[in-house]
């Protein structure tokens, strides 16, 4: 029986994983679930899966959860420092899913590595801002890493048993989001409602907006560069409106491999927990007959100007990537609250790339989590004071 921990159990990734586990409960024991505020959904999960440990990071929600579960023999904690009370390094759990969105996901990702045999990371911020810290701990504690993002899981699968220097180029695909065919003149009037209508994927609000600006692809390129130890010249984005082709690897022996699957995050999540097994997924597979027209084209950096940000990045890890992630996070929140216009997200991010105050961080490597978090807080305050 595999012992499991899920960080962000009430979000889309965590909920999808629990749905998978529900169909195979005899083979899994959930040791820990964590949430921020959604205690109502958490309590349902606790009862359904007989969970004995939970972490609720929002204090008011923690108090309510403690009260509601006082007779359920469930240990309720309020922060991730309590992981030391739940787990020990001499008896590692089998699998941890890190699916907390935003910067809040970095600390628990780093904290759980020493307690788990395998870690699946669905949190972009953790990889972009803290990969050198994560990589160091993965090696130190001999923890196996599996990427969950569909593009990176696809690359990871395609590169199986291949030497990392055995390929020329890796392509990741983008649907183009809801505005791939919208007149450029109409971009200034894009509403929050418009931007949340993704044509192919059902996702959370933050990542849906990132998909609309194409910032999610900027992040995915940065992630791929870090995870697979590449340089930016080896990576390229292609527009693929149907979203069933996720990655292409062009090898130096004249062959190229591609990976296709349905637009359903359950597939990479399922394979992250069942890799190296012959477990069958109870979900529809893609109809191969639909592959008659891949319809691939280069991305338009006039329509999606944030792609230009990649030109400002060094192949060396730096704190500048934290600035980009933090600024985007704050700008998306402002847009979702109708404080700024859609175009302001891209324009402000590009402006930041050309600001000397921030450019100095391009030569600075992140040394610890406090440095990353302090810079995140600083950038968030700076964006709030900027004239966007």
From Swiss-Prot:
Its cofactor is Mg(2+); Mn(2+). It comes from the Bacteria. The keyword NADP applies. NADPH binds at residues 10-13, 37-38, 123, 125, 204. SUPFAM superfamilies: 1-deoxy-D-xylulose-5-phosphate reductoisomerase, C-terminal domain, Glyceraldehyde-3-phosphate dehydrogenase-like, C-terminal domain, NAD(P)-binding Rossmann-fold domains. 1-deoxy-D-xylulose 5-phosphate binds at residues 124, 150-151, 175, 198, 211, 216-217, 220. It holds the Pfam family DXP_redisom_C. The keyword Protein biosynthesis does not apply. One of its GO terms (molecular function) is NADPH binding. Pathway: Isoprenoid biosynthesis; isopentenyl diphosphate biosynthesis via DXP pathway; isopentenyl diphosphate from 1-deoxy-D-xylulose 5-phosphate: step 1/6. GO terms for biological process: isopentenyl diphosphate biosynthetic process, methylerythritol 4-phosphate pathway involved in terpenoid biosynthetic process. InterPro entries: DXP_reductoisomerase (IPR003821), DXP_reductoisomerase_C (IPR013644), DXP_reductoisomerase_N (IPR013512), DXPR_C (IPR026877), DXPR_C_sf (IPR036169), NAD(P)-bd_dom_sf (IPR036291). Mn(2+) binds at residues 149, 151, 220. Its EC number is 1.1.1.267. It catalyses: 2-C-methyl-D-erythritol 4-phosphate + NADP(+) = 1-deoxy-D-xylulose 5-phosphate + NADPH + H(+). Keywords: Isoprene biosynthesis, Manganese, Metal-binding, NADP, Oxidoreductase. Catalyzes the NADPH-dependent rearrangement and reduction of 1-deoxy-D-xylulose-5-phosphate (DXP) to 2-C-methyl-D-erythritol 4-phosphate (MEP). PANTHER family: 1-DEOXY-D-XYLULOSE 5-PHOSPHATE REDUCTOISOMERASE, 1-DEOXY-D-XYLULOSE 5-PHOSPHATE REDUCTOISOMERASE, CHLOROPLASTIC. Belongs to the DXR family. This is 1-deoxy-D-xylulose 5-phosphate reductoisomerase. It comes from Pelagibacter ubique (strain HTCC1062).
């Amino acid at each position: 029986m595999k012992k499991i921990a899920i960080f962000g159990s009430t979000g889309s990734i965590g909920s999808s994983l629990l749905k998978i586990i529900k169909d195979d409960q005899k083979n899994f024991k959930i040791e820990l679930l964590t949430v921020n505020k959604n205690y109502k959904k958490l309590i349902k999960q606790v009862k359904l899966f007989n969970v004995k440990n939970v972490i609720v990071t929002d204090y008011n929600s923690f108090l309510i959860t403690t009260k509601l579960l006082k007779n359920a023999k469930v240990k309720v904690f309020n922060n991730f420092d309590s992981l030391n009370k739940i787990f020990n390094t001499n008896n590692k759990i089998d699998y941890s899913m890190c699916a907390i969105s935003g910067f809040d996901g970095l600390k628990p990702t780093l904290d759980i590595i020493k307690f788990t045999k395998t870690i699946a990371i669905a949190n972009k911020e953790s990889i972009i801002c803290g990969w050198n810290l994560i990589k160091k701990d993965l090696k130190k504690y001999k923890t196996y890493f599996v990427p969950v993002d569909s593009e990176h899981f696809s690359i990871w699968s395609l590169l199986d048993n291949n030497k990392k220097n055995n390929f020329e180029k890796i392509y990741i695909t983008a649907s183009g989001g809801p505005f791939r065919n919208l007149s450029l003149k109409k971009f200034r009037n894009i509403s929050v409602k418009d931007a949340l209508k993704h044509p192919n994927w059902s996702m959370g609000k933050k990542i849906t907006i990132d998909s609309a600006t194409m910032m999610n692809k900027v992040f995915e390129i940065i992630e791929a560069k870090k995870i697979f130890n590449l340089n930016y010249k080896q990576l390229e984005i292609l527009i693929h409106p149907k979203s069933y082709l996720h990655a292409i690897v062009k090898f130096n022996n004249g062959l190229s491999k591609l990976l296709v699957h349905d637009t359903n995050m359950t597939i990479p999540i399922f394979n992250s927990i069942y890799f190296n097994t012959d477990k069958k997924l109870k979900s529809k597979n893609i109809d191969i007959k639909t592959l008659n027209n891949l319809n691939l084209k280069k991305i338009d950096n006039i329509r999606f100007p944030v792609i230009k940000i990649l030109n400002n990045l060094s192949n060396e890890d730096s704190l500048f990537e934290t600035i980009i992630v933090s600024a985007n996070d704050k700008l998306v929140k402002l847009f979702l609250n109708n404080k700024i216009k859609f175009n302001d997200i891209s324009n402000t991010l590009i402006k930041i790339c050309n600001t000397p105050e921030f450019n100095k961080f391009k030569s600075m490597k992140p040394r610890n989590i406090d440095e990353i978090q302090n810079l995140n807080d600083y950038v968030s305050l700076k964006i709030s004071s900027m004239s966007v």
